[in-house]
Structure formats: structure tokens, C-alpha cells
Amino acid sequence: MEAVILFPAIDLKNGQCVRLEQGDMARATVFNLNPAAQAQSFAEQGFEYLHVVDLDGAFAGKPVNAQAVEAMLKTIKIPVQLGGGIRDLATVEAWLEKGITRVIIGTAAVRDPDLVKAAAKKFPGRVAVGLDARDGKVAVEGWAETSQVTALEIAQRFEDAGVAAIIFTDIARDGLLKGLNLDATIALADSISIPVIASGGLASIDDVKAMLTPRAKKLAGAIAGRALYDGRLDPAAALTLIRNARAA
């Protein structure tokens, strides 16, 4: 089957590695004071691609935790995709030059779709769109505001733009270990040609198994956060499952 990727997540707040519940900055749990050490740990566990979000940046509209991100890039060799506060072409370019493999544009994808198109054209394969939905509608500004458009409506705007992936997050499940919203994610993946990555709520090896079933064949991967930090998801078991599925 196609190469499905399990991305371990590092969310940055005040230079620390945290997990939020439903995107609420007041409900942040610090899991590691040293994000670079956490990144190194994930790389050593065998993960092949890291997912990083600058939470402060998402709220500020510009990069805030650049120092922590740069420390990670110096520490690990695996590719990193980064979101949070990326709202203009200059920021996209700056991060890619610093060694980020793929940037994720969220709020600006809703507010300024031309930015995504310009960035994807200039940097083919290196621009992803982050669509975070609450009750089907896309939320912006670090999830502080909910728009009136659906994830599918926005995703369709980028069908021919050369976007590398869409990261679809179900806010209601994020950080709560309730399981991925595979129904909504698969429905989105089946409606567009852009690869879709599932995010929000991954709770156990069962989610990884579900992601590898025939009905989820269009999914490009999933993001694991709290389940890894809480020890509910064994990295070795999850990665072995994925490797075996690839070989099948």
C-alpha cells in the first residue's frame, strides 16, 4: 500500500513541549522542557517525520518559538513539518531556508488562499494546508475563531495548486484521546486529490490499525500527540504495523 506516515507531534508554548486539550491554551500540560531532546527521542524511536506546531505563533500570527524549532533542526536529521504563525511568503521562505522540510499554512489558507497558491508554486511539494474543524467548520487564529466555511470547501480551492498535503484536525477530539475522527477525514480524502493527514484524538494502536484498513486507503498518515506522551501508544508496535502494511 501507499506509504502511510505516523507523525509524532511537538507543540511549542513558551519554548516548551506541551499538549493542549481542544486547542485551549489554558489547558496545557508540559511534557518536556527541552523540545530538541524530545525531537531526538522521537527520531531514535524510529519515527521518520516530525510534526511541529508553534502554538504561540498561531495566536500571534508570526513565529514565536523560532529558537526551539532551530534547536530541533540542529539536533535531528529526520524531516520536519512546521505550522503556527506562517502567514506570509517571507516566513515560508525563511523556514524552508532554515531546514524545515514542509510548512503548514492554516489561518492564511482561509484568509488569503492566494498565499498558499503562490507558496506552493514557488516551493513545490513543500507547502501543506492545515484545516482545523469544529463541528465541520474551519477554525482560525489558533482556533480562537470559527469561520463559516467547511474543510471541504477550502480544500477544493487548492485542488490544482500543488499543495503537498492537507492536515485535517478535529478540534473536538484534540488532546482528549477519544480516537481519530476517521469518518470525517476519510470523507474529505475521498473528495479531493490532495493527500490528507488525520489529526486530533489518536488514542491507541486501534487508531493506527483503522488507518491501515482498505476504507482509509487514501489517507497519507496521522499525527500522534498525547497518546505517545501518555504511553498509550507504543511507538515500536505502531511503526511495525505501518512497515508491515507498506510491505504488503
UniProtKB/Swiss-Prot annotation:
* Pathway per the UniProt entry: Amino-acid biosynthesis; L-histidine biosynthesis; L-histidine from 5-phospho-alpha-D-ribose 1-diphosphate: step 4/9
Q: What is its EC number?
A: 5.3.1.16
* Subcellular locations according to the entry: Cytoplasm
Mind listing the GO biological process terms from this record? L-histidine biosynthetic process
Q: Which GO terms describe its cellular component?
A: cytoplasm
Q: Which keywords, in A-to-Z order, does the entry hold?
A: Amino-acid biosynthesis, Cytoplasm, Histidine biosynthesis, Isomerase
Enzyme class label: isomerase
CDD domains the record matches: HisA
Which sites are catalytic?
11 (proton acceptor), 132 (proton donor)
Q: Which reaction does it catalyse?
A: 1-(5-phospho-beta-D-ribosyl)-5-[(5-phospho-beta-D-ribosylamino)methylideneamino]imidazole-4-carboxamide = 5-[(5-phospho-1-deoxy-D-ribulos-1-ylimino)methylamino]-1-(5-phospho-beta-D-ribosyl)imidazole-4-carboxamide
Pfam family example for this protein?
Answer: His_biosynth
Please name the InterPro entries in this protein's record. Aldolase_TIM, His_biosynth, HisA_bact_arch, Isoase_HisA-like, Isoase_HisA-like_bact, RibuloseP-bd_barrel
What molecular function terms (GO) are annotated for this protein? 1-(5-phosphoribosyl)-5-[(5-phosphoribosylamino)methylideneamino]imidazole-4-carboxamide isomerase activity
User: Looking at the record's lineage, which domain of life comes first?
Assistant: Bacteria
Xref: SUPFAM superfamilies: Ribulose-phoshate binding barrel
Tell me its family: Belongs to the HisA/HisF family.
Q: Which HAMAP family match?
A: HisA
Protein's recorded name = 1-(5-phosphoribosyl)-5-[(5-phosphoribosylamino)methylideneamino] imidazole-4-carboxamide isomerase
Q: Could you tell me which species this protein originates from?
A: Bradyrhizobium diazoefficiens (strain JCM 10833 / BCRC 13528 / IAM 13628 / NBRC 14792 / USDA 110)
